[in-house]
Amino acid sequence: MTSQLPARTKSILVIGSGELGSAILQGLLSHPLYDARASSISLLVRPTTLSSPSPEKAKQQVEFQALGIKLVAGDIEASQDELTALFQPYTSVLHAGGMALPAGSLLKLTRAVLAAGVQYYAPWQHGVDYDVIGRQGGQGMFSEQIDVRDLLRAQSSTAWVVISCGIFTSFLFEDFWGVVKKLPGNKVQVTALNSWEDIITTTRADDIARCTAELVFNADAPVNEPVYIAGDTLTYGQFADVVGRALNREVIRQAWPLGYLREESQKDPEDKLKRYRVVFAEGRGLSWPKEETWSAQRGLKLMGVEEWIRQHFV
């Protein structure tokens, strides 16, 4: 088995233990090519979280260690030089959580990975297609992600992969996102961002993780480019139909046009969520045909929206 493994699988560091990071750890451990004798898997944990964890984090840490995952003390808000030293022992770094990081953190992290000579890097780029959205999309909120891509494309020492998965399925159903809201009287409200004809791609975290593991462990997997995956690709109109059917509820439909969302964002320019909604209402770089994705061509069966609702939202 070990002869099939690319060199990048020898020592893997995962950054982030939230929904995606935890799923990636499980995805790596459960991959058919994973061999504990040939690959070590580590998780970066803040020193304070390691020494004084909350009850929830303490339980999580015990579970991770029981699975053979090494817990490594380190803070991604440390200096670039400190991060470079931290990353040097690893052949792969997989970053799985960066929405709340201060500006400049993603670039610093990428520079540290490159300076450390890490063989393989999956940056925090999970989501939409930043190349298509461009630097101006969402009032420039994704310009740092584009800078990260420019940095990676300008070098050839570290192989990299960007996983374009659309919006996380769980995020699509979060109350704060505002797209799906259960109402009294066996009703559910679905709000389209811009119009009912706008299209979105969505993938659940567990499937993003499965695809990540598949990319890491297979020597013939694509590198140095974005890889597109999809659990579902559908219009908001189709999405509303699916929600109503899966929940067996009457759907109350409303749309927030792009102009309205831009006005709301301009009133509160520091609110990232409102800027995200503008990006989704602008309609660029948000979707791709499911049948044309790498995951479909690889024969990976990913969970669609209807099945996700029946398992997680009923």
Give the label of every model feature segment:
Residues A96, W124, G166:
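Conserved residues at the C-terminal ends of beta-strands
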Residues L50-A116, D131-I133:
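NAD(P)H-binding glycine-rich loop region in Rossmannoid oxidoreductase-like domains
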Residues Q119-Q125:
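Short beta-strand elements of ligand-binding domains
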Residues P257-V314:
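A hydrophobic C-terminal alpha-helical subdomain
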Residues S11, T91-S92, Y120:
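Structural motif
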Residues T2-R46, L50-K59, V128-E250, L261-S265:
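Oxidoreductase cofactor-interface core, primarily capturing Rossmann-like NAD(P)-dependent enzymes
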